[in-house]
C-alpha cells in the first residue's frame, strides 16, 4: 500500500488555504480542485471551510482512488465529490453536477509526488523506467511513441517550445539517427543519448535531460493546451467574489497563467481616453501582487517547491459578456489556442453529485 503521508507534501499550503478560504465561508460554497492528486490541498481547504463542498478532478485514476481513501479517513467524504477527468473538462464536469457557478477554483500544475516517485511511468530521469509519461494511462500517446514516430522537425518543435532546450536540433537529429537501430523504450536510453549530445560546458544545473523530459511530458499530456483551455472555463464559472488560485512550476505554465490573469486586471480601453466606462474597468483583483514563491524553509523541507509560482485573482465584478464570449471561444480552441497531445478522457466519470446550490 502506498504511504501517501510520506510522499505527498502540498506546496505553499498555508498560502493556498488563505487565498481559497475567504471565498468558501458561506453556506453551500463550492470549490473545485482541478488537479486533485493525493488531496493534500483539498483536505486543508475543506477543514478550513466547514460549510463548503469540493469537487476533486484528476485524470490519474490511481491518485483519485488514494485521494478518496484519504478523504474518508479524514471524515470529509460527505463533502467531497471525486471525478475522473482531465481538468480541461471542467465545463462538462460542472454540467454533469448541474452546477452553473462555483466559488473557488484551484490548480496545482506540478506532477504529484505519486507520479514522480512511482518508477513505472517514466516521469523521472532519476530512475530507469519505460518511456510512458502518461498521467492517464488509458490514453494512447506515450513518450516512447513520440520518439518512435515524430520526425526531426516535430521533435525540435516540442524540445524547443516545451523544454526551452538550447540543443533541440542536435538532440532531435540524434534520436532520429539512432531509433531505427535502437528503439527508445526506457528513460535510461534517452538519458544516455542526451548526455552524449549536450556539451559539458553548456549543461543546466542538474540532469542535462531534464528539459527533454519536461517537453515530452507536456506533449504526451497536452498540458499547456489543457491549461490554456481550462483557465477561461474557470473564470466563466466563478461567482462574483470567486477566486482562481494557480500554482505553476515552470516558466511556460507561469507565463500562460500570468497572461490569462492580466486580461482581467487591466482597463479594457485604448490608452488616452479621458473617461473610462464602467464596463471597461478590470474584472479581476490581483490577490498575490505578482507571484508568491516558496521561502528557504519550505524549499529545505520540500525541494520540489523551489520553482513554484503561486498566482491568484478574485472576480471583482460580473465579467462582461464580450469577455465571457472570448473566454468560451478560447476554451474551445477558437482563439489561436492549439490543442495538441493526447485526447482527454471521453467523458468525465463521477460517483456522486452535489445537490445543494448557492442561494
Curated annotation (Swiss-Prot):
Main enzyme class: transferase
Keywords: Cytoplasm, Methyltransferase, rRNA processing, S-adenosyl-L-methionine, Transferase
Compartments (UniProt record): Cytoplasm
Reaction catalysis annotation: cytidine(1402) in 16S rRNA + S-adenosyl-L-methionine = N(4)-methylcytidine(1402) in 16S rRNA + S-adenosyl-L-homocysteine + H(+)
GO molecular function per UniProt: rRNA (cytosine-N4-)-methyltransferase activity
Transmembrane stretches, start-end: none
UniProt EC number: 2.1.1.199
Binding residues annotated for S-adenosyl-L-methionine, in chain numbering: 39-41, 58, 87, 108, 115
Gene3D superfamilies linked: Putative methyltransferase TM0872, insert domain (1.10.150.170), Vaccinia Virus protein VP39 (3.40.50.150)
Gene Ontology cellular component terms for the protein in this record: cytoplasm
Matching InterPro entries: RsmH, SAM-dep_MeTrfase_MraW_recog, SAM-dependent_MTases_sf
Main location: cytoplasm
Positions of region (Disordered): 339-359
Ranges annotated as biased composition (Basic residues): 350-359
GO biological process: rRNA base methylation
Annotated function: Specifically methylates the N4 position of cytidine in position 1402 (C1402) of 16S rRNA.
Family from the record: Belongs to the methyltransferase superfamily. RsmH family.
Protein name according to UniProt: Ribosomal RNA small subunit methyltransferase H
Amino acid at each position: 500500500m502506498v504511504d501517501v503521508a510520506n510522499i505527498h507534501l502540498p506546496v505553499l499550503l498555508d498560502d493556498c488555504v488563505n487565498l481559497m478560504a475567504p471565498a468558501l465561508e458561506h453556506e453551500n460554497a463550492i470549490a473545485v480542485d482541478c488537479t486533485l492528486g493525493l488531496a493534500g490541498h483539498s483536505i486543508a481547504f475543506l477543514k478550513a471551510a466547514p460549510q463548503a463542498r469540493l469537487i476533486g478532478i484528476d485524470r490519474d485514476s490511481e491518485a483519485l482512488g488514494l485521494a478518496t481513501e484519504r478523504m474518508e479517513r479524514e471524515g470529509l467524504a460527505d463533502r467531497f465529490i471525486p471525478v475522473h477527468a482531465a481538468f480541461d473538462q471542467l465545463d462538462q464536469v460542472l454540467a454533469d453536477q448541474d452546477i452553473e457557478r462555483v466559488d473557488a477554483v484551484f490548480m496545482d500544475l506540478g506532477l504529484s509526488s505519486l507520479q514522480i516517485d512511482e518508477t513505472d511511468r517514466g516521469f523521472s530521469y532519476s530512475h530507469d523506467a519505460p518511456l510512458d509519461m502518461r498521467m492517464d494511462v488509458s490514453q494512447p500517446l506515450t513518450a516512447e511513441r513520440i520518439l518512435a514516430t515524430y520526425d526531426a522537425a516535430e521533435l525540435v518543435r516540442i524540445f524547443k517550445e516545451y523544454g526551452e532546450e538550447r540543443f533541440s536540433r542536435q538532440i532531435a537529429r540524434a534520436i532520429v539517427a539512432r531509433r531505427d537501430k535502437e528503439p527508445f523504450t526506457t528513460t535510461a536510453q534517452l538519458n544516455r543519448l542526451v548526455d552524449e549530445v549536450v556539451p559539458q560546458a553548456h549543461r543546466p544545473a542538474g540532469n542535462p535531460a531534464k528539459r527533454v523530459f519536461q517537453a515530452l511530458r507536456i506533449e504526451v499530456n497536452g498540458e499547456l493546451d489543457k491549461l490554456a483551455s481550462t483557465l477561461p472555463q474557470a473564470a466563466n464559472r466563478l461567482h462574483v467574489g470567486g477566486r482562481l488560485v494557480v500554482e505553476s512550476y515552470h516558466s511556460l505554465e507561469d507565463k500562460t497563467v500570468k497572461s490569462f490573469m492580466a486580461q482581467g486586471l487591466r482597463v479594457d480601453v485604448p490608452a488616452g481616453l479621458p473617461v473610462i466606462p464602467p464596463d471597461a474597468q478590470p474584472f479581476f483583483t490581483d490577490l498575490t501582487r505578482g507571484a508568491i514563491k516558496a521561502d528557504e524553509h519550505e524549499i529545505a523541507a520540500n525541494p520540489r517547491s523551489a520553482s513554484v509560482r503561486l498566482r491568484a485573482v478574485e472576480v471583482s465584478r460580473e465579467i462582461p459578456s464580450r469577455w465571457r464570449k472570448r473566454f468560451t471561444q478560447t476554451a474551445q480552441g477558437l482563439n489561436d489556442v492549439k490543442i495538441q497531445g493526447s485526447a482527454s478522457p471521453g467523458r468525465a466519470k463521477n460517483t456522486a453529485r452535489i445537490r445543494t446550490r448557492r442561494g
